[in-house]
Every structure is written in C-alpha cells, then in structure tokens.
Regions:
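Targeting-peptide/extracellular-domain and disordered-appendage signature
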Residues: 3-369
C-alpha cells in the first residue's frame, strides 16, 4: 500500500467514487428482510429489552371497523415506549378517521381533539393481563388498553370501546441495516364494540415497533422511507362467512425488500420472499387504485374500498388506503375484514433492483427437513 493511500485514509478523505453503488456496504444486506410467525407471551410484551440493537420505538394501535350502515372507522393511537431514547412524541393523542358525513373517503373526526395525550401514561401487569392507562391527572378523555396473548381491549372515553381475540399466531419481521432498520411485531385481533355510539366490527393491529435509538417510523432512521425501499406495505385479514380466514403481511419494494406472510383459520402460516407485483396509481398518480401481487404461486389483488382513502391524514409520501385483499378469482363472501395500508408513488409502481452486483438469492425448500 502506498504512502499516498495511507495519507488519504488518515485525513478521512473518501476514496469512493461519486457513482451509485452496485452492491451494499459492510453491515447492509441489500435490504433483505427476515420474517416468520411467533408465539406472543406476557413476558415479551412487558419487556423493554432491545432486539438486534434496536430499543422499543412505540406501540401502535390501529385498525379498521365498519358499522351496520357500511360507514368506515379507522382509529389509531401511538403509545411511546417511555424510554430516554424515545423520539419526540409528535402523535400524542387518539385519532379517528371516518366516512361519517363524507363521500370522498375518511376524514379526521373531532373526537380526538379532546382525548388525553400520552404524557405520563402507565404500563402495568395485573394478574395475567397488561394494562396501559392514561395519567389520571392528564387533561382530556382518558384511555385504557389491555392485552393478553389471546385477547385485548381498547377504550377511548366518549369515543370507542372495543374488545376481541387474537387471530393466531403473531407475525414478525426484521429489516437489518447499518444505520436504519426496523423490527416489526404484529398481533392482529378481530374486534367488536362501539365507536361514536355505533355498533362496529373489524380488525386491529396491536403492534410494537423497534428501531435504532432516536428512530421514529416514517420520520428518522426508517429505511423504508429514506432508502426509498417501500412500494407497498399492508397488514390485512379477512374472515369469510364460511368461517375460513386469510391474514398476513404483504410488502413489495425495491432492491431485495419484499415478503409475504400468510396465515389461515387453522393457525398455519407460510412466508416467502419471492414476491412481485405492480401498483396502479391511475390518472391521479397519487392514490393507488389497485394492486396486483404474486406470492406463493398465486395471483392476488387489492381492491380499494370506494371510500377507503384516508384523506384526513393529509398529503403523505405514502398515501393510506383501506380495502380488501383476495386471491384473483376467489368467490368466498367476506364477513369482517381490514386491509389498511399504503403505497409510495414517488418510489415507483413496480420493484427495481438498484444493486445489480449484489448476487443471486437462491431459495431453500425447508420441507426437506
């Protein structure tokens, strides 16, 4: 090695060219995820331990409900982990988007303005049930959330009172990266109760997320956004009138990002990284109007609800749309469902591998074991 090369390294000057990389740097793997099912436990839900060097970022409660008149309700609350590493809490209250009084999609309902902020909320284990409660002296309508490995409840004073059972098992996925990444833990619950006094049925995600210190989903250290990986990200479930159920996660992205997890009413789970598809952004170029998706040797389609656009969230990089996933040609009649997810129009409408020298991933048939 020449002295001139040593000098460049010592002074910290980069020896890399300005051309776009064709393979990952050390510590990156081309944005390949790792996914599987898992068994939810009280111990794990109570713990504040880090996974893969990522502390808890927050617990996300969110879902889709429909009343007897077909009106749609999408509630959401982000509960920070309460650690010193937490990012500033910019989503501090209960939010509810609904089609009530609107024909063009879901708008923000004012009930959230009077909800209690997350400041000082508590997390306790009482018997075999975990409780999250708003601070008793905090101003606003209180909240109370409970969880066990089998059931949960979510109460927002003067707004919502729902409860239900886990669609088993849990699902989780990990996206490694040297500076940005995510570990996402998904618990889907089938729920019923009342929202704004209306009887409703639907599904929610009860999902802890882990990110590098200071990270916050969609904002900082989120590779799906800052690396422009994400094309499609949906958590979804459908129970049919014959009692069968499909549920899972469907993602699609650039480079090596993308996977599908699929479960059924027997608790059987399959997962694959061999996925592809295309998003139809229509003439508007922003709101997706349908998705074609290939996984497990089947063709799938996302059917947006005619009023499924969450316009109340404002203009986003990843506009949110609710609807329903199904296999192409599936004639089963849905009974209760949710598929609230997103597509990112600025990232493209179909996958692109921007790392052509990464190498070829070869699948393994684990059935041989």
């Amino acid at each position: 090695v020449s002295l001139s090369n040593h000098s460049i390294i010592a002074t910290g000057k980069s020896t890399m060219s300005d051309t776009k990389p064709t393979m990952p740097r050390r510590g990156d793997f081309g944005w390949q995820p790792l996914v599987s099912a898992f068994e939810p436990t009280i111990e794990d839900m109570m713990s504040n331990r880090a996974y893969f060097g990522m502390p808890p970022e927050a617990l996300y409660l969110w879902g889709t409900f429909r009343d007897e008149d077909g009106e749609i309700y999408c509630p959401m609350r982000r509960v920070p982990a309460g650690l010193q590493t937490d990012a500033k809490d910019t989503r501090r209250r209960f939010y509810l988007c609904t089609t009530l009084g609107h024909q063009d999609g879901m708008h923000m309902h004012p009930v959230g303005k009077n909800s209690v902020p997350n400041d000082g909320c508590s997390k306790t284990l009482e018997g075999e049930r975990i409780h999250w409660r708003s601070h008793p002296q905090a101003p606003g309508n209180r909240f109370h959330v409970t969880w066990t490995p089998d059931e949960c409840s979510w109460y927002e004073e003067n707004g919502m009172d729902i409860e239900g059972r886990l669609v088993k098992p849990g699902m989780h996925w990990y996206l490694p990266g040297r500076d940005a990444g995510m570990y996402y833990v998904a618990n889907i619950f089938e729920m019923e109760g009342t929202i704004l006094g209306k009887k409703v049925r639907g599904m929610i995600g009860f999902d802890p997320i882990y990110m590098y210190e200071g990270g916050e989903i969609y904002k900082t250290k989120d590779a799906l956004v800052q690396e422009k990986l994400e094309l499609v990200w949906y958590t979804w479930a459908t129970r049919y009138k014959d009692g069968s159920i499909d549920f899972g996660h469907f993602t699609l992205g650039n480079d090596m990002f993308g996977f599908a997890i699929l479960g059924n009413e027997k608790g059987e789970v399959r997962y694959t990284y061999d996925v592809t598809g295309k998003v139809d952004f229509g003439a508007n170029g922003y709101w997706q109007e349908g998705i074609r998706y290939s996984a497990f040797g089947d063709e799938w389609e996302f059917i947006p609800d005619p009023k499924g656009r969450l316009v109340g969230l404002g203009t986003l990089k990843n506009p949110q749309v609710d609807g329903r996933w199904r296999r192409v040609g599936d004639t089963r009649e849905p009974d209760v469902w949710f598929a609230w997810g997103e597509a990112a129009p600025e990232h493209g409408d179909r996958p692109v591998n921007r790392l052509p020298d990464l190498g070829t991933r070869v699948g393994v048939n684990f059935r041989k074991y």
